């Protein structure tokens, strides 16, 4: 039986390439040191074990470089899978899941009790110190009920559609996050909010991340998605957009479907004080590192010129 040959040592060229990469990253490390970056973790990357480990490594790397990461995660597909297992049908309006009392309890169970703990474990296994939270902890995310209206084609009357316990953040109380950051702990937040009446609300993870980014005065909001970023009408990636250009992309139909609410989240965050927001492909290994620490970045950056 032949023994496996040892892996070849890196060549001089490979070492030089790594040195150039580190040299390129240095000014970006200085730029972000001591600043907060909010990362929304979602999409198919959450279902890929290898990408999940790489994501956790990137979060720990950010922390080791002096950045204060805050993670907000989604979990729509996992909620859908649990509802299917329980034989509960899902209904959507404008991409939002109609959420009755039973469904919001299941959503909280999946988001806070399962997904959140898995992400915390991944970060801790990678050498970080993470703690799981939901928006209900210390009234972190106060939410109000979301409503939608649709015009009836027969009567031409606008009808209000009750989405149940779906909420939008109206206030973020970041005191708990500041305490965790001062203790060098990485917060991992499930997008569950609490209403003025104590009711639990399911919140879109992008929306929650944007509100948190504004509340903690983050330097960056990173939305990990399943697309490369904002595409022009020829399906080419737009690497950078001003606030005005991003709004035009919505108005003129360049942005369509699920990209519209993501751009709107970025606009609210930037208008709320975040320096820039980036929509990037979470399926790309180390997308966060590419965005933060390389000249070319990754995805589409939306900010004020």
From Swiss-Prot:
The keyword Kinase applies. Pathway: Amino-acid biosynthesis; L-arginine biosynthesis; N(2)-acetyl-L-ornithine from L-glutamate: step 2/4. GO terms for cellular component: cytoplasm. GO terms for biological process: arginine biosynthetic process via ornithine; L-arginine biosynthetic process. One of its GO terms (molecular function) is ATP binding. It is an enzyme of class 2 (transferase). Belongs to the acetylglutamate kinase family. ArgB subfamily. It catalyses: N-acetyl-L-glutamate + ATP = N-acetyl-L-glutamyl 5-phosphate + ADP. This is Acetylglutamate kinase. Keywords: Amino-acid biosynthesis, Arginine biosynthesis, ATP-binding, Cytoplasm, Kinase, Nucleotide-binding, Transferase. The record marks 40, 262 as: Transition state stabilizer. Coiled coil: none annotated. Signal peptide: none annotated. The keyword Transferase applies. Catalyzes the ATP-dependent phosphorylation of N-acetyl-L-glutamate. It is found in: Cytoplasm. Substrate binds at residues 75-76, 97, 202. Its EC number is 2.7.2.8. Its main location: cytoplasm. Gene3D superfamilies: Acetylglutamate kinase-like (3.40.1160.10). SUPFAM superfamilies: Carbamate kinase-like.
């Amino acid at each position: 039986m032949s023994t496996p040959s040892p892996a070849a040592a890196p060549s001089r060229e490979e070492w030089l390439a790594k040195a150039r990469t580190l040299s390129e990253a240095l000014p970006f490390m200085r730029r972000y040191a001591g600043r907060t970056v909010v990362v929304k973790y979602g999409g198919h990357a959450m279902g890929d074990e290898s990408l999940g480990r790489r994501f956790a490594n990137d979060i720990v790397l950010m922390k080791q470089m002096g950045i204060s990461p805050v993670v907000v995660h989604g979990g729509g597909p996992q909620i859908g899978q649990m509802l299917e297992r329980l034989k509960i049908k899902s209904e959507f309006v404008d991409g939002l899941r109609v959420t009755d009392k039973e469904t919001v309890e299941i959503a909280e169970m999946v988001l806070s009790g399962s997904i959140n703990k898995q992400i915390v474990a991944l970060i801790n296994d990678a050498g970080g110190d993470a703690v799981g939270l939901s928006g209900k902890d210390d009234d972190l995310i106060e939410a109000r009920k979301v409503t939608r209206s649709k015009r009836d084609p027969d009567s031409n009357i606008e009808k209000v559609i009750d989405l149940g316990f779906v909420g939008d953040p109206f206030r973020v109380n970041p005191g708990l996050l500041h305490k965790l950051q001062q203790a060098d702990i990485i917060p991992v937040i499930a997008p569950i909010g609490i209403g003025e009446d104590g009711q639990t609300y399911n919140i879109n993870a992008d929306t929650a991340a944007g509100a948190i980014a504004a509340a903690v005065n983050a330097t960056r909001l990173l939305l990990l998605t399943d697309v490369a970023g904002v595409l022009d009408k020829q399906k080419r990636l737009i690497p950078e957009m001003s606030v005005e250009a991003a709004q035009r992309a919505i108005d003129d139909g360049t942005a369509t479907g699920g990209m519209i609410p993501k751009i709107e989240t970025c606009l609210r965050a930037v208008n709320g004080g975040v320096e820039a927001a980036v929509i990037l492909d979470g399926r790309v290994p180390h997308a966060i590192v590419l965005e933060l620490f390389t000249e070319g970045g990754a995805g589409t950056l939306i900010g004020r010129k």
